[in-house]
């Protein structure tokens, strides 16, 4: 069964619909090339709303037909038919996703608020369809005696578990309450997201020319353009997004302004006004606990992790607690180094505060490693990084990316570009890759990857339509877009997700789903190719001279590879541990701000830095359920990443070794969710991963 609860991130097949609404017509473009593509250029909120409602109606009819089939249940007449159902809705979801994440407006947010409860009701009607579950159960029980083909058995097992985990076996009263809770949660998730977006759009810091000391020319030009676009001709705008906040805190010499920008960013959703998220979070936690209580679980984390690699919250916490002491010990060392620098540079004695950390860390980097992040940035051009990713994809996956001319493929914004993906050897078409790189009003913060259509072979081979989305500050006209090393790493990370989509070799749509603490592994692994010699020597060239990065600078980067790992690991772990602890505690009378503070105190969280995501804007966890009690998954996946990286490092051909690359594709990328992740990793590595490689990577001691 398609994962009915995160269907917003999937798309499957095409549908003919005799309706004037272009959102409800078969995906098409000139000559129906590339299997047809979404009509992004024809989107409007009202059209998408109409299509979503119709899609849900048709999909429910599809499921009812399956449930009411009088023939004895079989894999073919039940599970396969479920895999085929909801074609229109699957096609409409990309439009809904774009208007939610990339092109949000007040008009659409109102529609989103109307649709959220309807989507919840839609999911509940399927997951609580007794006749449908009876058919699935009959096939599942039969398979225990007469197992199906491996991929069929996997789909069946996932489908049965999805029903069971979502209340299909409850009595009618409990089913009713379960559905009511889902409905309430859907509204709260929508409100949470809109509140964060409000604060990101409305808390902008405007500077005058006297307040620009320390900032790069490129950043200043971008800030000027943003301010002009917002109607402030003689100002410079620092938007309330990470891509704007991070470089400002790193380079601005104005400590008072750093504090303002820092507080704006880390107070999103926590300003004590109508857009404050604390009461929403408390209610989300209470409802989640009540819902899993109906199923007999003690807490939400126990319910959620049963089908993850970690299996239970105890294992997830054990990993994080094993790394935490080394991380905060490293922070103490980093702060001591920064304090020495601050004492030398400041006329008056200061104590390192969170808005100082990035600024003084950069000073220490220069002193300790003679490494200037701004100097490195001159070699990190977004277009060259894109070429570098294509090169890596060619070497590992045998892919070729061909830029398509503007206007050939409909896009939702002029900044979006599209490439065709082909097999280098055969020329076989694999899919299309969309890139939406820049921040804009109405676009959610962060970086992400998604698919508009996934690969399957159930009813003929489908191509993949995948996208990467970033929030880089758009450069001034004629200027190169230069990014930080961290942002370049994130760019590679998200492209790793896209390659995971393109490499899929599964028959059934459900098998494109993922196990949350495994799906970040492939993307984190691809980050490692950014620092390979081939990428550095061929693609990291100076934006003015075109000269390759000098060896001396490369050596400095590699020598400083574990620099600031205390900060990076601690800010991440604090958020991941907080996520888990929120879902392990009794939320009956919880005060969210107080719980956050007390938990950080118990952890002995260094006061000089914040969590990566403070609770009131922790969208991974509270704008939906995708990462709820799952933020630990990045570290779980990083254990695999560090271990797998050593497999390449030890190979004769290094990170471009053809034999290891083939195993990478065959066992870690192509199967998607068709085999158990732990088994897949053992097929690749010959054993389970261990934590030692992770600790070595971060320069942490390990006993």
Label every model-predicted segment.
Residues 4-12:
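Sec-dependent N-terminal signal peptides
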Residues 298, 496-508:
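Catalytic Zn2+-binding segment of zinc metalloproteases
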Residues 15-16:
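C-terminal motif of bacterial Sec signal peptides marking the signal peptidase cleavage site
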């Amino acid at each position: 069964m398609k994962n009915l609860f995160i269907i917003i991130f999937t798309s499957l097949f095409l549908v003919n619909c005799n309706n004037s609404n272009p959102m409800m017509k078969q995906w098409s473009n000139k000559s129906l090339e590339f299997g047809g593509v979404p009509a992004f250029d024809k989107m409007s909120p009202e059209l998408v709303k109409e299509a979503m409602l119709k899609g849900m109606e048709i999909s429910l009819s599809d499921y009812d037909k399956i449930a009411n089939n009088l023939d004895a249940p079989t894999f073919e007449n039940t599970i396969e038919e479920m895999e085929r159902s909801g074609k229109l809705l699957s096609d409409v979801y990309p439009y809904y996703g774009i208007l939610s994440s990339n092109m949000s407006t007040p008009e659409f947010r109102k529609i989103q608020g109307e649709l959220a409860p309807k989507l919840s009701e839609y999911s509940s009607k399927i997951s609580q369809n007794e006749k449908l579950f009876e058919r699935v159960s009959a096939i599942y029980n039969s398979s225990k005696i007469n197992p199906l083909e491996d991929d069929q058995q996997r789909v069946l097992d996932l489908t049965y578990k999805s029903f069971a985990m979502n209340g299909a076996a409850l009595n009618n009263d409990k089913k009713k309450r379960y559905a009511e809770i889902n409905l309430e949660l859907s509204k709260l998730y929508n409100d949470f997201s809109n509140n964060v977006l409000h604060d990101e759009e409305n808390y902008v810091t405007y500077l005058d020319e006297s307040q620009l000391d320390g900032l790069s020319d490129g950043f200043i030009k971008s800030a000027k353009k943003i301010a002009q676009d917002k109607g402030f001709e003689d100002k410079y705008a620092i938007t309330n997004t990470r891509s704007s906040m991070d470089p400002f805190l790193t380079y601005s010499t104005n400590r008072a302004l750093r504090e303002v920008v820092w507080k704006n960013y880390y107070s999103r959703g926590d300003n004590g006004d109508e857009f404050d998220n604390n009461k929403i979070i408390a209610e989300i936690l209470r409802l989640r606990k009540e819902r899993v209580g109906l199923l007999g679980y003690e807490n939400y984390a126990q319910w959620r992790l049963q089908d993850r690699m970690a299996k239970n919250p105890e294992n997830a916490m054990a990993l994080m607690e094993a790394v935490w002491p080394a991380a905060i010990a490293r922070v103490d060392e980093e702060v001591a180094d920064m304090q020495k620098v601050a004492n030398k540079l400041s006329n008056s004695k200061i104590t390192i505060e969170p808005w100082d950390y990035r600024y003084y860390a950069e000073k220490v980097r220069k002193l300790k490693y003679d490494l200037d992040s701004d100097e490195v940035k001159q070699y990190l051009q977004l277009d060259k990084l894109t070429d570098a990713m294509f090169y890596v994809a060619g070497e590992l996956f045998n892919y070729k990316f061909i830029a398509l001319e503007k206007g050939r493929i409909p896009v939702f914004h002029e900044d979006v570009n599209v490439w065709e993906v082909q097999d280098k050897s055969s020329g076989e078409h694999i899919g299309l890759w969309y890139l939406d790189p820049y921040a804009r009003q109405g676009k959610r913060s962060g970086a992400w990857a998604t698919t508009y259509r996934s690969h399957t072979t159930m009813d003929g081979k489908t191509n993949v339509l995948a996208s990467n989305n970033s929030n880089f500050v758009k450069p001034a006209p004629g200027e190169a877009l230069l990014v930080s090393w961290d942002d370049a790493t994130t760019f590679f990370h998200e492209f790793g997700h896209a390659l995971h989509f393109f490499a899929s070799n599964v028959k059934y749509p459900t098998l494109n789903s993922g196990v949350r603490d495994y799906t970040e592994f492939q993307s984190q692994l691809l980050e490692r190719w950014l620092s390979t010699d081939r990428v550095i020597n061929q693609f990291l060239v100076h934006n003015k001279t075109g000269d390759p990065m000098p060896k001396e600078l490369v050596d400095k980067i590699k020598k400083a590879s574990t620099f600031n790992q205390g900060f990076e690991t601690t800010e991440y772990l604090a958020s991941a541990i907080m996520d888990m602890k929120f879902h392990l505690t009794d939320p009956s009378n919880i005060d969210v701000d107080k719980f956050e503070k007390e938990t950080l105190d118990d952890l002995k969280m260094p006061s000089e830095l914040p969590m990566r995501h403070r609770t009131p804007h922790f969208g991974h966890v509270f704008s939906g359920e995708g990462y709820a009690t799952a933020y630990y998954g990045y570290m779980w996946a990083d254990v695999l990443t560090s271990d797998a990286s050593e497999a390449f490092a030890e190979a004769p051909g290094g990170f471009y070794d053809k034999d290891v690359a083939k195993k990478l594709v065959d066992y870690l990328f192509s199967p998607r969710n068709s085999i158990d992740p732990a088994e897949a990793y053992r097929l690749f590595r010959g054993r389970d991963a261990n934590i030692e490689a992770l600790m070595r990577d971060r320069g942490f001691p390990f006993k």
